[in-house]
A protein has these predicted regions:
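Glycine-rich phosphate-binding loop and adjoining helix at the ATP-binding site
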Residues: 110-121, 125, 132-136, 145-203, ...
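Anionic-ligand binding region
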Residues: 209-211, 219-239
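Short glycine-aspartate micro-motif
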Residues: 77-81, 134-138, 211-215, 221, ...
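Short beta-strand scaffold segments in enzyme catalytic cores
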Residues: 87-91, 143, 202, 220-226
């Protein structure tokens, strides 16, 4: 089995987005063909010690040459990162470099599978209007998924958003749905659907030892990769932590807002310390939108035991997720 190895670092330019229809080459269509620049998501800056997924921005000529070469060598991937509050999409070249700006659409509850399909379809149509297209689709979404089937998803089955009352109609619509098959049929493209933390893991893991990825956003996401093989998904977020509360209850976004970053960060540290005796990972990565909010004092407390990764890993992993899944399937077939 060939372990998944690091892709070449992607280039990145500042978050001042290219205006609609106006790139350095004159328009978005030209950028789709040749620019290959990565546009940062609007997230808090990560401090020193962050995993080096990105290098400094190349010259326009180098970026165009690199992206053109990548486009020839592999398919373009339309990556979809599904969160409790919004759906983000971006077009990636074969190297995982973002082409043009990402798009974000707020989730409006109740949120059905058809609503997700329609958001993806609208963003795909916008790409085509700009002269772009994709050959495959990668979707990362919260919850337990097996072989593209939703076993359980925590947010979209609620009436008014995370931690609100269950909506029986949405629960029936989502849980048990073969979302991979539904999206593949809708878009007529090869489709991969994984837990969102597993997509982030694909952008991050080295294939050496037991690697764990924890993502902090609306709730807690997680992925486990053993020597380049993706382990069956476990939902740490639903496990009891203390006083009958789950990890999501204690370190999710609602609790962060209630406590403030300092107290919330201390709870994150305690949660990580409670997980280590159970898993005893070789490397732990922390990501997601709220990882950047972990305070410096807690970072120092965790220093030497964790690596921070950019929130963009949830999107950029859309390319390497295919390699991670293929390597995992080969390894299991050889057992």
């Amino acid at each position: 089995m060939d372990p998944v190895s690091h892709a070449e670092p992607s280039a990145r330019i500042p978050a001042s987005r290219v205006p609609e229809g106006r790139g350095p080459e004159g328009h978005v269509a030209a950028a789709c063909v040749a620019a290959g620049r990565v546009l940062e998501s609007e997230e808090p800056a990560l401090p020193l010690g962050t995993a080096p997924l990105y290098a400094s921005a190349p010259s326009p000529e180098d970026a165009a040459n690199a992206t053109t070469a990548a486009a020839v060598s592999g398919p373009r991937t339309f990556a979809v990162d599904c969160g409790g509050g919004g759906i983000k999409t971006a077009l990636l070249d074969a190297a995982g470099t973002q082409i043009g700006p990402a798009r974000r659409t707020p989730v409006r509850y109740p949120f059905s599978p058809a609503a997700l399909e329609n958001i993806i379809a609208a963003d795909a149509a916008a790409l085509r209007a700009e002269g772009c297209d994709f050959e495959r689709l990668t979707v990362g979404m919260p919850g337990m998924l097996r072989h593209g089937v939703v076993v359980y998803t925590p947010h979209y089955i609620r009436r008014a958003g995370p931690h609100t009352r269950l909506d029986p109609e949405m629960e029936a619509a989502w849980n048990g749905l073969d979302i991979r098959a539904a999206l593949a049929a809708r878009f007529s493209r090869p489709t991969l659907v994984l837990n969102d933390a597993e997509v982030a893991a694909a952008a991050t893991v080295t294939g050496r030892g037991l690697e764990v990825v924890l993502t902090f956003g609306t709730g807690l996401g997680n992925a486990i990769v053993d020597s380049g093989v993706l382990a069956p998904h476990l939902e740490f977020s639903h496990a009891p932590l203390r006083w009958g509360l789950t990890y999501d209850d204690v370190i999710g976004e609602i609790e962060r807002i209630r406590l403030g970053d300092a107290a919330w960060s201390r709870q994150v540290a305690r949660a990580i310390e409670s997980l280590y005796p159970v898993i005893r990972w070789d490397t732990l990565y922390l990501g997601g939108g709220n990882a950047a909010r972990i305070t410096e004092s807690v970072r120092e407390r965790l220093s030497g035991s964790v690596v921070f990764i950019p929130n963009a890993a949830g999107m950029s992993g859309g390319v390497r997720a295919w390699d991670l899944v293929a390597a995992s399937e080969r390894a299991r077939a050889e057992q």
